């Protein structure tokens, strides 16, 4: 074998920025067993039937989407030779497994532990047009333009846009003193996704050549935001719990944050959310403990674009 190829057989630091994000993720690992989801059963009777249906739908989507992310991670890893990037994605896959297990716990809780009822619901709901629109849009974009750069834009949109309204809708439960454990899990998952979107933006900026035209990036962001807002509006109940207008504005604000992170001009110029928005604290650069109700400190500082 040529001597220049021998580096394949040992680890050599090449991407200090990605290595730092991997280290941050490792230092903040948590498990689905850290909280007891059974504590949230008491809140089920506090929801109206429409609200219960809404949150069942949200967690059906999140559970399915988490699997979609894991599938995409495997394909993205193959695009790079740097071991730091490979190692980062292995770490992210481990975290996504925890997310999937948590979503399963919460989903079953929303069906009062009735597994057969959960299966019946998911079999029908997974084909809901609002969910399928996201999946089909992604599949179409990957099929039409399989460039590495555009795949990364799509990954940024999956992690940074297609989860936003769901995270916000769950966070509104906290504002109403409901589902304390579910909200704790939501805090941790959304903060993990902050690291994931940061990593995707970092890899796109520093390790992906030949970026798409700004007009193309704006087109993809515009379509993704439109789909995400329609997703929320199609199922959000008329309820005291969720402010649909505030969430749709937050989706647009998040899109602008992500565009800025990849050095592309903003598209929506939407102002930041009001101080009472349940995810507003996540856009601040905080040095406080991310695990506010957890005994393990969440190390480091992450600015969340979600």
From Swiss-Prot:
Which parts of the sequence bind Fe cation 2? 96, 159, 193, 196
Any idea what this protein is called?
Ribonucleoside-diphosphate reductase small subunit
Q: Where does Fe cation 1 bind?
A: 66, 96, 99
GO biological-process terms attached to the record: deoxyribonucleotide biosynthetic process; DNA replication; release from viral latency
Role: Ribonucleoside-diphosphate reductase holoenzyme provides the precursors necessary for viral DNA synthesis. Allows virus growth in non-dividing cells, as well as reactivation from latency in infected hosts. Catalyzes the biosynthesis of deoxyribonucleotides from the corresponding ribonucleotides.
What is the top EC class of this enzyme, as a single word? oxidoreductase
**Organism, scientific name:** Varicella-zoster virus (strain Dumas)
Catalytically driven reaction(s) = a 2'-deoxyribonucleoside 5'-diphosphate + [thioredoxin]-disulfide + H2O = a ribonucleoside 5'-diphosphate + [thioredoxin]-dithiol
Instruction: Note whether Transmembrane helix occurs among the keywords.
Output: yes
Per its UniProt entry, which superkingdom is the organism in?
A: Viruses
Which EC number(s) does the record attach to this protein? 1.17.4.1
Q: How does it assemble?
A: Heterotetramer composed of a homodimer of the large subunit (R1) and a homodimer of the small subunit (R2). Larger multisubunit protein complex are also active, composed of (R1)n(R2)n.
**Record-linked Gene3D superfamilies:** Ribonucleotide Reductase, subunit A
Q: Name one GO molecular function term.
A: metal ion binding
Q: Extract the CDD domains matched here.
A: RNRR2
Q: Does the keyword Transferase apply?
A: no
Q: Please list the residues that make up the active site.
A: 103
Q: Which residues cross the membrane?
A: 153-173
The Swiss-Prot or TrEMBL record describes its family as follows: Belongs to the ribonucleoside diphosphate reductase small chain family.
Cellular component per GO, a single term = membrane
One Pfam family this chain carries? Ribonuc_red_sm
What cofactor(s) does the depicted protein rely on? Fe cation
The UniProt keyword set, sorted, is: DNA replication, Host membrane, Iron, Membrane, Metal-binding, Oxidoreductase, Transmembrane, Transmembrane helix, Viral latency, Viral reactivation from latency
